[in-house]
Amino acid sequence: MMALVMSVTMMAEDRVLAAAKDQKPRSPEEIPASLSLSLSEAQDYAVKQNRTLKNASLAVQEAYAQRWQTIAAMLPQADGSYTYSNYCGYTAEMTMMGNKININMPNVGALGVTASIGINGQGVVGALLNNIAIDMKKIALEKSEDELRSSIMSSYVSVLALQSITNLLDSSLNNIQNLERITQNAVNAGAAEQTSADQIRVRVNTLKNNINTQKRNIELATNSLKVLLDVPVETELTLTDNIDHILSPERVLTLLATDFDIRNNLNYQQVAKSAELAKRNVHMASWAYGPTISLAYNYSNQQYYGEGGMRMTPPNTVQVRVAMPLWSSGKRAAGVIEKKIAYEEAKNTLSEMTDNLAIQYRQLCFNLTNAYETYINEKDNIEVSQRVFNSATEKFKWGAASNLELTNASNDLINAQSTYVNAMLTLINAQADLEEFLNK
């Protein structure tokens, strides 16, 4: 029995220590100088490297260790001791029937071994409570992972969107700069006024400022993504996915067609486990009325180093003990009532969440549908605005459009680009929210 206990104990310790070793910091050699990642690869990489997620994983291992402590407390326990006593030549005196008797007190060594086992209802329920705690830690870990994946997707798409807009602005800038050169040549030849060239120069500077702003936004978004990936800012990051693949109609429609199973929702699972925990706490409080049964074995061996000495302690002792609580002035009863009230509160919270989640699901589906429709419209708007701008540029080149028309077309394109980015980010956030809600 003791060999089995030692074996299980060592297995539990090895499991916790192995998990802790897996979390060791990376050496400089393990930090990549460059990374090329698709969206799914970025999410998997972040799940593996993110420190917050590592802590959540360690919390699960910690819960396993706590459960083993509870179980081990109900398994056999053994303690050994050795005591050496030196009486420094002392001789005890006893008077018996008027006669004094001297008793030598030799040095003595005492070896003692105690083995015991005790169990009660609260200990058993405590082990069940630890199981629920482990489940809750696992749910929290899964929830943290889902939140991290959603954050990675939003950050990843933000970088792609800003890069796409910057490319469009670069193309528009090239067209405007060509017009600037043509107009300035016309001014130099006396075929146009300097005002026309100056107005186009203003548009050129405006686009340059806009491009510079977008480039700084790209750097900021990329650094935010690097933080989530837990890589240094010096690491060169290349995103290999494209927006059309991530924001595909098929993906959105498939998500909207997914049936809602409340049991898959992580928030529901957490509250349900809390209600189960509250129920077990009622059982725990009720077992305060239960008995505690314990069994103990004591072995004692005394060795006298010298003459004399009396062996008055039996070498082997077996004890069986049953302890039963009798009276606590209502303390235990109040404890049971308290836990029952807490259980009722937990059930009410669970019922309320069940209703709220059904409403939240409909709202998230509405948000995704609305965001997708807006994205499609804004995507079409930016294509139309780009065509209008290209047409106005070409007309202006041949004198068929005024500076005002060119300026309006340029402003419309910039506004369309800004609105398009906002629509794109709104869509990806709505998609991530519904995926996280459905635990997909």
Regions found by a protein language model. Name each.
Residues D22, L37, E147-I262, L364-N367, ...:
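Periplasmic alpha-helical coiled-coil/stalk elements that build and connect Gram-negative outer-membrane
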Residues I71, T114-G118, S286, A323:
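Transmembrane beta-barrel domains of outer membrane proteins
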Residues K54-A73, V125-N185, V202-N209, R216, ...:
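Extended amphipathic coiled-coil alpha-helical segments
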Residues K54, Q77-T95, I117-E147, Q269, ...:
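Small/polar (Gly/Ser/Thr/Ala-rich) solvent-exposed segments
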Residues M2, M11-I31, V233, T419-K440:
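Acidic, low-complexity, intrinsically disordered peripheral segments
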Residues A12-D79, V233-K279, L326, T354, ...:
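Bacterial Sec-pathway N-terminal export signals of envelope proteins
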Residues E180-A197, V388-L406:
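Alpha-helical hairpins and coiled-coil heptad-repeat segments
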